[in-house]
């Protein structure tokens, strides 16, 4: 239902909206873009110079979505906007912009333009939240469900790999059963905005091809909802005939935009490549000299040093950080998000982001990688940049005097590599060399040999003027393709591929990897997610893999403790292979291939062992040879290996890495009291591990030996001991440990009872194999508050059966109504709304199997047989993995048996009776939605028969009782043909959207305990 027409928004109010949200009026091009989209319904690509606010496309989308709803017009504006950048960012400006917009909408008064926009968005999404802002990152738990409703307006910032793999039904670091939901949300009702599209051209074309295939669906509504694609680059489009939107004279003469377009950036070349044996050292030394030269002439005390690789950036930072006359900060994108958040809170970084004061006592030098090229709103007064491709240099120059206020903004392009072949120069190859050769024809060149600071400083005022208005003349009649990284070979997306990708359960073998369709054929393998744990033990120098896996099940990983690393670099790190680490903050870049010895086949090099999460099997498995480090997987390393510090990935084995496994975003997840973990958190070293271990061991011994009524006192005493000032708390992460221990100290009751935690008391888990280790699980949140539990995936056998005990009839009605509400908010046709409502009623009727009910009663058969109503939810603690497995064993419910298989049998039998119940007009869709509501049946349910078949009585939506035989729950031979027909009818992403609508409704009701 649209907002009342009296509150209808007008396009002319966009300027007031931007003023209220951002504190300034939009530039002329921004207003013109909004009008153009509103009139045509088409989102043109943007050809806008850096510094003129291209991220404002988020504001335009938000306003247009609300405007269209408030006027009662048929919605054509997508409900989700994906802002994609193909690099690792230390600051995600698009996400920060979306978060500020979200907050403004939340805080706005009802009579303001922003308040009216917020009201329209709430009505449209059927939610109390006007807008969600989400960072898309992978995970192996429920945190990967990044949108709660398919109708929720949302801005999602992402990398190419994270968005693209999800679009293609193969989400990296995502549960296989979650992939259809991810694909639906990425491929339907979505606007894909790609920044720096010249390095993400494969994604542009792949997404456009996917949209074209979805448009062939025979269902007209779902055919029209395919993803729409927008490029924010002047040199890249999904196809040659795409409309483009550019600046006009109104922008050139604008008092603010015009000044930015005329910024006085002067470019000088510094050649440090002669006789450079170690190019990294040569870059660091030359960068230090260049910094000194810039300090002589800059008008504000802040300058940047941008390197092409993390290794070079760290080398320059190492030299500059030893000086007392400057403040230095290092920014790289490949770091754990929790480390990144702490770095952004550092006073120097906070000052940089707020704007450096001109009267600052010491100059601030920012050493960085490609991570500052986009996504961060900073302005340097001077710049040193390693030579790179033309596009990269233009982006880096865009960080120099962004406001155009300085009379002189000098930049030094530094070359320390000379090309001998395409692989000599890391990241950019021959494009960097050709760009240098072109610049030499126009800009002054200074040789490093014999150079001193005054000589270089004197050249800076003579540099080449480079800004958005002079750049076109500099590139007249120039083939810029030679100055940039070559366009990759992009494979064609065809229907056979899409049909194969849509088959997510089971996936085809062999399966087509999505990487070539996201980065091109001639690119390196995609990343792996890496995390470190300090409680992974060895026995006689050998890894105890069983203990490792147990620890990971007990405290599953979360997104804030992971970092994405190229698979080849992780192999090099674990095998201690020779050769420089050329890791950059770009994704999917071409790289030199890993060396393969000539002659006969060599055995794999010795490798430090690790642990990998097998998404297909849902288990942690050992990794002992390099080939098992598979791109796209999640890998756990012992903290003692090193490889990461407060700034991010180091690629070196120097210091142990702090274990951040106990600090996800929720406060109710398990916390390990382990001496090795606590020592790294509180002191940064292992000096007092013995004292910590002794304290925990004493408490563990008492918990085993003394009366359970003493449990709370013992745990409280242990926490007091750990919080005692006698234990050092001066480590870099001591505040995290101190805050968590204090929060646990506030828990009033603790118990070691097998039943686990409740809303009133926390649960203490003892480690039978290690007396110096225990785990504390805080009480569950009060009724009505949601909880997402790491490690409980949607594809677990009883995942939908967790949380509080809920009767099956109550849950079925709740899911039916929620699915219907979601479908109505999506403006789906009445027949599809009816189908989703009916599927919601029937989806869990297979849980009436007696052994499944026994499992939901923790294995208590007597209790299950005396229930007044069958259960949908067990009431078991989601964090109690052992308890869940024990309940299934006691009930003799095989972990691969699926209750939805029985539900599908019951729905099929019910439909055979031709019920008069309102259910839509597609019975095949109804059966599929029920069968697929945990991500299976795409196209097959697991072929697992009931070893002890029984008759199951299922209650259907019209209260008719249907009896089915669980012996029939094996292979559904009609499934593949039904799945193929439904994909043709609704499109691959359209069918996935219908599934997602039901599944998200089920998950929401499960979390809420309704």
Residues covered by each model-derived region:
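Conserved pre-motif I regulatory segment
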Residues: 2-48
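Divalent metal-dependent catalytic cores for phosphoryl transfer on phosphate-bearing substrates
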Residues: 427-436, 440, 798-805, 824-1010
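Inter-Walker segment of RecA-like/P-loop motor cores
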Residues: 106-177
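Conserved strand-helix element at the start of the C-terminal RecA-like helicase core
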Residues: 80-94, 294-321, 330
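Interdomain hinge/linker at the junction between the two RecA-like core domains of SF2 helicases
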Residues: 220-228, 232-297
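Walker A/P-loop
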Residues: 41-61
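C-terminal helicase lobe and adjacent C-terminal extensions/tails of nucleic-acid helicase motors
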Residues: 284, 291-293, 300, 315, ...
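Conserved Walker A/P-loop ATP-binding site and its immediately adjacent core
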Residues: 75-103, 107-116, 161-165, 200, ...
């Amino acid at each position: 239902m649209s907002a009342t027409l009296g509150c209808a928004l007008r396009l002319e109010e966009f300027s007031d909206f931007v003023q209220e949200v951002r504190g300034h009026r939009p530039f002329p091009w921004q207003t013109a873009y909004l009008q153009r989209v509103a009139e045509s319904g088409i989102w043109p690509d943007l050809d806008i110079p850096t510094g003129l606010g291209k991220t404002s496309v988020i504001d335009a989308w938000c306003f247009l979505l609300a405007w269209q709803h408030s006027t009662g017009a048929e919605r054509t504006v997508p409900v989700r906007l994906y802002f994609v950048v193909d690099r690792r960012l230390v600051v995600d400006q698009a996400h920060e912009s979306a978060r500020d917009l979200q907050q403004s909408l939340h805080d706005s008064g009802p009579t303001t333009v922003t308040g009216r926009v917020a009201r329209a968005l709430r009505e449209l999404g059927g939610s109390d939240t006007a807008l969600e802002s989400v960072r898309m990152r992978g995970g192996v738990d429920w945190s990967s469900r990044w949108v709660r409703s398919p109708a929720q307006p949302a801005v999602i910032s992402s990398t190419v790999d994270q968005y693209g793999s999800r679009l293609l039904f193969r989400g990296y670091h995502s549960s296989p059963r979650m992939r259809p939901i991810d694909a639906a949300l990425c491929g339907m009702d979505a606007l894909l905005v790609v920044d720096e599209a010249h390095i993400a051209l494969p994604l542009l074309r792949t997404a456009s091809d996917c949209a074209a295939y979805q448009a062939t669906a025979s269902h007209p509504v779902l055919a029209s909802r395919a993803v729409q694609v927008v490029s924010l680059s002047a040199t890249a489009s999904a196809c040659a005939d795409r409309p483009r939107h550019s600046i006009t004279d109104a922008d050139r003469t604008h008092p603010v935009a015009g000044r930015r377009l005329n910024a006085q950036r002067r470019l000088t070349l510094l050649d440090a490549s002669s006789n450079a044996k170690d190019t990294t050292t040569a870059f660091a030394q030359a960068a230090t000299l260049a910094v000194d030269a810039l300090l002589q002439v800059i008008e504000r005390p802040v300058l940047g040093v941008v390197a092409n690789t993390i290794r070079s950036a760290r080398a320059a930072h190492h030299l500059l950080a030893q000086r007392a006359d400057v403040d230095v900060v290092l920014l790289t994108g490949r770091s754990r998000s929790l480390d990144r958040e702490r770095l952004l809170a550092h006073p120097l970084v906070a000052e940089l982001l707020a704007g450096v004061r001109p009267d600052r006592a010491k100059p601030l030098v920012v050493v960085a990688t490609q991570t500052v090229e986009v996504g961060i709103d900073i302005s340097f007064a001077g710049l040193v940049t390693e030579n790179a491709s033309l596009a990269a240099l233009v982006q880096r120059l865009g960080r120099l005097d962004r406001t155009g206020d300085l009379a002189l903004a000098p930049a030094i392009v530094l070359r320390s590599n000379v090309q001998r072949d395409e692989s000599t120069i890391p990241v950019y190859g021959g494009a960097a060399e050709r760009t240098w050769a072109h610049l030499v024809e126009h800009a002054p060149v200074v040789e490093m040999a014999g150079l001193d600071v005054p000589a270089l400083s004197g050249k800076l005022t003579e540099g080449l003027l480079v800004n958005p208005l002079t750049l076109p003349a500099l590139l007249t009649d120039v083939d810029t393709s030679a100055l940039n990284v070559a366009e990759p070979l992009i494979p064609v997306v065809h229907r056979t591929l899409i049909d194969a990708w849509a088959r997510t359960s089971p996936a085809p073998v062999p399966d087509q990897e999505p990487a070539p369709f996201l980065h091109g054929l001639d690119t390196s393998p995609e990343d792996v997610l890496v995390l470190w744990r300090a409680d992974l033990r060895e026995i006689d120098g050998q890894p105890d893999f069983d203990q490792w896996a147990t620890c990971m099940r007990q405290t599953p990983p979360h997104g804030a403790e992971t970092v994405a690393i190229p698979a080849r670099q992780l192999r090099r790190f674990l095998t201690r292979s020779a050769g420089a680490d050329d890791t950059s903050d770009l994704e999917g870049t071409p790289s030199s291939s890993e060396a393969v010895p000539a002659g006969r086949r060599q055995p794999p090099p010795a490798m430090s062992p690790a642990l990998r999460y097998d998404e297909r099997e849902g288990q942690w498995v050992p990794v002992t040879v390099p080939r098992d480090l598979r791109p796209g997987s999640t890998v756990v390393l012992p903290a003692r290996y090193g490889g990461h510090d407060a700034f991010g990935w180091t690629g070196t084995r120097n210091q142990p890495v702090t274990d951040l496994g106990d600090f996800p975003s929720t406060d109710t997840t398990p916390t390990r009291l382990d001496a090795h973990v606590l020592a790294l958190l509180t002191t940064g070293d292992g000096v007092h591990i013995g004292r910590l271990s002794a304290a925990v061991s004493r408490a563990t011994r008492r918990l085993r030996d003394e009366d359970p009524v003493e449990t709370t006192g013992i745990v409280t005493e242990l926490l007091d001991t750990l919080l005692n000032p006698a234990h050092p708390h001066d480590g870099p992460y001591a505040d995290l440990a101190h805050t968590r221990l204090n929060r646990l100290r506030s828990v009033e009751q603790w118990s070691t009872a097998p039943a686990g935690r409740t809303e009133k008391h926390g649960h203490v888990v003892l480690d039978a194999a290690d007396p110096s280790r225990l785990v504390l699980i805080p009480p569950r949140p009060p009724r009505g508050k949601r909880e997402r539990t790491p490690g409980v995936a949607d594809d677990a056998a009883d995942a939908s059966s967790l949380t509080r005990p809920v009767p099956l009839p109550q849950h079925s009605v709740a899911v039916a109504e929620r699915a219907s509400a979601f479908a109505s908010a999506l403006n789906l046709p009445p027949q599809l709304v009816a189908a989703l409502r009916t599927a919601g009623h029937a989806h869990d009727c297979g849980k009436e199997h007696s052994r499944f009910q026994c499992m939901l009663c923790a294995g208590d058969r007597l209790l299950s047989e005396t229930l007044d109503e069958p259960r949908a939810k067990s009431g078991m603690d989601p964090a109690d993995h052992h308890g869940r497995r024990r309940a299934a064993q006691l009930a003799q419910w095989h972990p691969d048996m699926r209750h939805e298989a029985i539900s599908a049998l019951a729905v099929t039998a019910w439909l055979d009776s031709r019920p008069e119940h309102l259910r839509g007009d597609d019975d095949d869709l109804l059966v599929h939605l029920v069968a697929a509501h945990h991500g299976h049946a795409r196209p097959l349910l697991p072929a697992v028969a009931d070893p002890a078949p029984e008759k199951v009585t299922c209650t259907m939506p019209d209260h008719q009782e249907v009896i089915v035989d669980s012996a029939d729950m094996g292979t559904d031979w009609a499934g593949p043909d039904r799945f193929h027909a439904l994909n043709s009818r609704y499109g691959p992403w359209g069918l996935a959207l219908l599934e997602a609508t039901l599944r998200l409704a089920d998950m929401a009701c499960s979390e809420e305990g309704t």
